[in-house]
């Protein structure tokens, strides 16, 4: 395993631990999710380039499309929650409350 792969895996684990530790605010959770998805994109692109697997060349691009959709939905949810409640706490996202 090369040094680049190790750095990408460290970036993924740092983003994952950030998501687990700082989950009270929605903005920090979205930033950690974005870091995880971008490190997965880099890891997928490096793996496909190293293995010369031509059938999976579109997988990183599809992953980026899903990441863009996730970011757009997350930011729309952040705007909606901050306009409704005034804060971006994740505890305000409970839809079972009346």
Curated annotation (Swiss-Prot):
Q: Which residues cross the membrane?
A: 1-21, 29-49, 61-81
Q: Which PANTHER family match?
A: NADH-UBIQUINONE OXIDOREDUCTASE CHAIN 4L, NADH-UBIQUINONE OXIDOREDUCTASE SUBUNIT ND4L
Relate the assembly described in the record: Core subunit of respiratory chain NADH dehydrogenase (Complex I) which is composed of 45 different subunits.
Q: Which GO terms describe its molecular function?
A: NADH dehydrogenase (ubiquinone) activity
Annotated signal sequence is none
Give the function comment from the record. Core subunit of the mitochondrial membrane respiratory chain NADH dehydrogenase (Complex I) which catalyzes electron transfer from NADH through the respiratory chain, using ubiquinone as an electron acceptor. Part of the enzyme membrane arm which is embedded in the lipid bilayer and involved in proton translocation.
**Keywords recorded for this protein, A-Z:** Electron transport, Membrane, Mitochondrion, Mitochondrion inner membrane, NAD, Respiratory chain, Translocase, Transmembrane, Transmembrane helix, Transport, Ubiquinone
Does the record's keyword annotation contain Transmembrane helix? yes
The way this protein sits in the membrane is described as:
Multi-pass membrane protein
Its GO biological process annotations read:
ATP synthesis coupled electron transport
For whether the record's keyword set contains Magnesium, the answer is: no
Report the GO terms under cellular component. mitochondrial inner membrane; respiratory chain complex I
| EC code(s) of this entry | 7.1.1.2
Q: Which reaction does it catalyse?
A: a ubiquinone + NADH + 5 H(+)(in) = a ubiquinol + NAD(+) + 4 H(+)(out)
**Family, per entry:** Belongs to the complex I subunit 4L family.
Which principal EC class is assigned to this enzyme?
translocase
Localization per record: Mitochondrion inner membrane
Q: Which Gene3D superfamilies match?
A: 1.10.287.3510
This chain belongs to which protein, by name?
A: NADH-ubiquinone oxidoreductase chain 4L
Q: Which domain of life is it from?
A: Eukaryota
Q: Where is this protein chiefly located? A: mitochondrion
């Amino acid at each position: 395993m090369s040094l680049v792969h190790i750095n990408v895996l460290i970036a993924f684990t740092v983003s994952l631990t950030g998501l687990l530790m700082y989950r009270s605010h929605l903005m920090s959770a979205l930033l950690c999710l974005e870091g995880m998805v971008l490190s997965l994109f880099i890891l997928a692109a490096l793996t496909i380039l190293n293995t010369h697997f031509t059938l999976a060349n579109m997988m990183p691009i599809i992953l980026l499309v899903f990441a863009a959709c996730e970011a757009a939905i997350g930011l729309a949810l952040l705007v909606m929650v901050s306009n409704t409640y005034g804060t971006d706490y994740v505890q305000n996202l409970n839809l079972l409350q009346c």
